[in-house]
Amino acid sequence: MSSRKYFGTDGIRGRVGQGVISADFVLRLGNALGRVLTAGRSKRPLVLIGKDTRISGYMFEAALEAGLVAAGADVQLIGPMPTPAIAFLTSTLRADAGVVISASHNPHYDNGIKFFSAEGEKLDDATEAAIEAALDAPFHTVESERLGKAIRTRDAIGRYIEFCKASVPRGFTLHGLKMVLDCAHGATYHIAPMLFRELGAEVVVIGAAPDGLNINDGVGSTHIDNLAAKVRETGAQLGIAFDGDGDRVLMADDQGNPVDGDDLLYVLARSWQASGRLTGTVVGTLMTNYGLEKALAALQIPFQRAKVGDRYVHQALVEGGGTLGGETSGHLLCLDRATTGDGIVSALQVLEALGRDGHSLREALSSLSKVPQQTVNVRLGGGAAKAIVEAASVQQALQQAQAAVQGRGRAFLRPSGTEPVVRVTVEADEAGLMQDTLDRLAGAVRDAA
């Protein structure tokens, strides 16, 4: 939807206390959602509210609850839970919507709101448009007898752990595996260690002491070096890192080498092809490494690229009948197991694949050769990023760059939609070619700016 006023590609996000990420706006947002859900129906809708561990979550949880109850919706407060857990619980508890208070991998001073439909999927454009329209209407409180009620759910953790365990065969075990878990001081801190221990693993845990301010602070999937160092220090066979809200996962092998989302896609695609589980096309994004594209082609596995954002990966999978896709950042979609990106479920799928194939993580990646890739952000002194990208001189430079790496890599430009920046990305099978092409293309963008 091109005319979004508040919603981005993944809900609403920003700095706490600024713009829309304020208590008064979130109060109105809850009321708007409640009015959309109650329209044309006599039964009170049920909305689940979950959050990650950042301190502002208390404030926004209360604001959402008040706005929803005022509009006549019932609320179940789930407390700190991974984003994908709220997607699952919304569906299994037969709720009409789920809301997550989280800014994912961002620092504690940011926060955001994500929404899920009754099916546990991200809201469609029409529903988001209806919420935005309701936001621009006055706050409404229903008559006292129609006010909603709010309760706190106590069994959510157990329900979600069983859901995750059900994503792998009943006989699946991790006995004999020593692993490091980095929970980013986020929403998986009280769930992931318990789950992997229940499956038999010896678990070393870091990033599992949230204080409201330390979420993603030097830990988690955006700081993978911390995990890698702990794997080497403890002699673990692998490490797993989640982000603050648990929808991303990255890993480290037994030598502490970082393993990103492209690597994990390869492990899963290759294993699923061999076992007959793979269906349709594997979906990556514009940022997916060219080496993965080549490796999948060698296995005769169809691959396509979507725009950056797991929303677009999901859309491409649904349209193409596929079940496996993801982003370099660690958003992985296993749609035959979960409706949305789920870090814990994705990690279990990788561990199951390794166990079935009899490989270590490092061995499973030995046949994948990624190419050097680099992105430069060119900040513009003036003019819109899209206009700079479309300038004749920049388009000519882009064509020359693409010709230089043809058959050996890719070159492309992405104008930022939120800041005066053009992102210049080049990848090639030889580092010198990549760097030279990148320098020339970035220079052309700077000259045009």
Swiss-Prot record:
It comes from the Bacteria. PANTHER family: PHOSPHOGLUCOMUTASE (ALPHA-D-GLUCOSE-1,6-BISPHOSPHATE-DEPENDENT), PHOSPHOHEXOSE MUTASE. InterPro entries: A-D-PHexomutase_a/b/a-I, A-D-PHexomutase_a/b/a-I/II/III, A-D-PHexomutase_a/b/a-II, A-D-PHexomutase_a/b/a-III, A-D-PHexomutase_C, A-D-PHexomutase_C_sf, A-D-PHexomutase_CS, Alpha-D-phosphohexomutase_SF. The active site is at S104 (phosphoserine intermediate). Its cofactor is Mg(2+). Activated by phosphorylation. Keywords: Isomerase, Magnesium, Metal-binding, Phosphoprotein. This is Phosphoglucosamine mutase. Belongs to the phosphohexose mutase family. PROSITE patterns: PGM_PMM. GO terms for biological process: carbohydrate metabolic process; peptidoglycan biosynthetic process; UDP-N-acetylglucosamine biosynthetic process. Catalyzes the conversion of glucosamine-6-phosphate to glucosamine-1-phosphate. The modification Phosphoserine is found at S104. It catalyses: alpha-D-glucosamine 1-phosphate = D-glucosamine 6-phosphate. It is an enzyme of class 5 (isomerase). One of its GO terms (molecular function) is phosphomannomutase activity. Its EC number is 5.4.2.10.
